[in-house]
């Protein structure tokens, strides 16, 4: 992460362009490292969720390892075609995240989120960029609950949520780390 990086930029590249490329390369390198170090715990969760037939939890577990393609396949195999389409776009466009957040807000305002499986809401909330918590309505106000997004995750996977889904990919790695520290 802190090793010198040969950016292979032309000599006349501006300092701003140099800094932009350097930040992107460092974030990509950090992301790759994080994917590798969380792979074993992700696979342990995957095996447990498959054994218990918890398909939506399986999708979430795969996303916590940034295994987006496998998560989309798992959603598709579970019969969640629409969810698979959204999962395939995980961590991407801010417009997609905003659309998913709008849907969550609508469900919450109408109180129907109380009838949606919490594992499913957790996946939708993550896709919307919520990496700390998500609110769920209750039939009565006292029944309202909060879903802790990083519940059951070690610090590396929790940090990964911020890197991959909580901050725009274009933002510097430092923004993801600050977001994680603030949580």
Give short role names for the model-derived ranges.
Residues 1-30:
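Intrinsically disordered, low-complexity acidic/proline-rich regions
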Residues 19-20, 24, 28-183:
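Long all-alpha helical scaffold domains
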């Amino acid at each position: 992460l802190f090793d010198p990086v040969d950016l292979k930029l032309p000599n006349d590249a501006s300092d701003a362009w140099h800094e932009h490329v350097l930040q992107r390369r460092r974030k990509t390198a950090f992301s790759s490292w994080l994917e590798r170090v969380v792979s074993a715990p992700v696979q342990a969760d995957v095996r447990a969720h498959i054994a218990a037939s918890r398909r939506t939890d399986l999708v979430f577990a795969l996303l916590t390892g940034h295994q987006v393609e496998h998560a989309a396949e798992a959603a598709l195999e579970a019969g969640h075609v629409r969810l698979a389409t959204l999962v395939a776009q995980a961590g991407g466009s801010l417009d997609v995240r905003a659309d998913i957040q709008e849907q969550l807000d609508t469900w919450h305002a109408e109180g129907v989120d109380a009838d949606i499986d919490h594992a499913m809401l957790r996946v939708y909330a993550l896709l919307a960029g919520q990496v700390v918590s998500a609110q769920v309505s209750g039939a009565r106000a006292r029944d309202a609950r909060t879903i802790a997004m990083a519940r059951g995750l070690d610090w590396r996977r929790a940090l990964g949520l911020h890197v991959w889904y909580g901050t725009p990919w274009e933002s510097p790695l430092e923004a993801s780390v600050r977001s994680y520290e603030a949580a």
